[in-house]
Curated annotation (Swiss-Prot):
One of its GO terms (cellular component) is nuclear membrane. Transmembrane segments: none annotated. Residues 18-27 have a biased composition (Basic and acidic residues). Residues 295-468 form the Helicase C-terminal domain. It catalyses: ATP + H2O = ADP + phosphate + H(+). The Q motif is unique to and characteristic of the DEAD box family of RNA helicases and controls ATP binding and hydrolysis. This is ATP-dependent RNA helicase dbp5. Belongs to the DEAD box helicase family. DDX19/DBP5 subfamily. It comes from Aspergillus terreus (strain NIH 2624 / FGSC A1156). It is a peripheral membrane protein. Residues 28-40 have a biased composition (Polar residues). Its EC number is 3.6.4.13. SUPFAM superfamilies: P-loop containing nucleoside triphosphate hydrolases (SSF52540).
Length: 487
């Protein structure tokens, strides 16, 4: 499909040519994709999310009981009926179009549902059914027999952002829709001081700081909690402040609580932390070499400076609205400025950053899910876990980088890049990611990303916007089986 390949710029025409020799700067061809996409299979199709599309991979299990055989049939299940679930939960699974367990669920569910409860540290990419796995475990352990227990917190799910928390609530609502008297509470930063005097819910989903505050103020009573789940656990434990907040929350909970950590990525130091956070846990992982982001065409555009970045973005606007698109920028200020300029020029865009109040953030993400807003400008608040089925393009307006002291060379943030581009190409569909490069530092960071993931990010020549449009439209509209990636 040569017509889809970006055209190489004449010698001296691209940023790469200006910085280094073409033969040295051109990345080696590779069909291997970055490891893992960091997404959460959170939003059911009824809420604008994606249907489960299971990739090929193998699941490895390491049991805390070293004498036990992880390949024992007791530690695997081929259908939901074999788990002895409440028929009403089976109805909920059917409503989610879950006909049989995914590979992750085959191994995770027997471990999660075992009695006495055991801790679990699970690493799995998105689209594997991990959200449904921990929600199913929670619903199976609830006691809803009395009004008092219906209003008593029995399970707590912690998420790094308000948006992911709301998405998880949506999964619980769909899977638990046939359970009478199921009450779900949210503990996220409030816009005003309108918190309830008491948290009366059997399942609570929230962010660490708000949950800790509600427990300390006795708004939420943790005495009857049976299950603690950390979703996007690597983000929670690795992000400055959130890791400490998680520790403080856990210290306020019953010692017998079942701790479950699920995430798409577990860097070594975070895995060590997680092992302490969930001691004597069963471990479940995907074979690392098979964790890939498939179906994402990775491209980059040369820009002469910051202003040229903006002009390029405006030129891309028509393509951004083919489906839905997310534009990732470095700072809240950049997001606001770009939104203001584009709206003034008559373009329909929305922005979502951590600085926006809660209810407004909810409204923006709901509009984006519904398709009322097709272009969303955001910081890394959306880089993880949000599943919106219509996203076909991601723009790295600013290449993600680690926060390092000013005197150190700029370093690309590989995990954030992975999570960002994972917003597109969701569950079997084709997507496009485009990175803007405007200076030597950004070019170096792009090269770091290519080398780290052993992949090729192709350059598009912006001299012919008709050709750019043709390349991207053909890629988006192609079924994944017909698309070419990393070539």
């Amino acid at each position: 499909m040569s017509s889809e390949q970006p055209t190489e710029a004449p010698a001296g025409g691209s940023l790469a040519d200006r910085i280094s020799k073409p033969e040295e700067s051109k990345p080696a061809d590779s069909t291997q994709q970055p490891t893992d996409n960091g997404q959460t299979d959170g939003a059911p199709a009824q809420l604008g999310g994606s249907e489960l599309h299971e990739p090929e991979y193998n699941v490895e299990v390491k049991l805390s009981d070293l004498q036990a055989d992880p390949n024992n049939p007791l530690f695997s299940v081929k259908n939901f009926e074999d788990l002895g679930l409440d028929p009403r939960i089976l109805q909920g699974l059917s409503a989610m179009n879950f006909r049989k367990p995914s590979k992750i669920q085959e191994r995770a569910l027997p471990l999660l549902l075992s009695n006495p409860p055991k801790n679990l540290v699970g690493q799995s990419q998105s689209g594997t059914g991990k959200t449904a796995a921990f929600v199913l475990n929670i619903l199976s352990r609830l006691d809803l027999s009395t009004e008092q227990m219906q209003k008593t917190p029995q399970a707590l799910i912690l998420a790094p952002t308000r948006e992911l928390a709301r998405q998880i609530v949506g999964v619980i609502q769909v899977m638990g829709q046939f359970l009478d008297n199921l009450i779900i509470g949210t503990a996220v930063p409030a816009d005003t001081n309108n918190r309830p005097a008491r948290m009366e819910a059997s399942v609570v989903v929230g962010t660490p700081g708000t949950v800790m505050d509600m427990i300390k103020k006795r708004i939420m009573v943790p005495a009857k909690l049976q299950v603690l789940v950390l979703d996007e656990a690597d983000n929670m434990l690795d992000q400055q402040g959130l890791g400490d907040q998680c520790i403080r929350v856990k210290a306020l909970l019953p010692r017998t609580i079942q701790v479950v950590l699920f995430s798409a990525t577990f860097p070594t130091h975070v895995h060590q932390y997680a092992s302490k956070f969930a001691p004597q846990a069963n471990e479940l992982t995907l074979q690392h070499e098979e964790l890939t982001v498939e179906g994402i065409k990775q491209l980059y555009l040369d820009c002469s400076d910051e202003e040229d970045k903006y002009r390029t973005l405006v030129s891309l606007y028509g393509l951004l609205t083919v489906g839905s698109s997310i534009i990732f920028v470095k700072t809240r200020q950049s997001a606001m400025e770009i939104e203001k300029r584009m709206v003034a020029e008559g373009h329909t865009v929305a922005s979502l950053t951590g600085g926006i109040e809660g209810s407004q953030r909810d409204a923006v993400i709901d509009q984006f899910r519904a398709g009322a807003a097709k272009v969303l400008i955001t910081t890394n608040v959306l880089a993880r876990g949000i599943d919106v089925s219509t996203v076909s393009m991601v723009i790295n307006y600013d290449i993600p980088e680690l926060h390092l002291p000013p005197n150190q060379p700029r370093q690309a943030d590989f995990q954030t890049y992975l999570h960002r581009i994972g917003r597109t190409g969701r569950f079997g569909r084709v997507g496009v990611s485009i990175s803007f490069v405007s200076n030597r530092d950004e070019w170096n960071m792009l090269n770091q990303i290519q080398k780290y993931f052993n992949t090729s990010i192709q350059r598009i020549d912006t001299k012919d916007w008709d050709e750019v449009e043709d390349i991207i439209k053909k890629t988006i509209k192609n079924p994944r089986s017909q698309a070419t990636f990393g070539k």
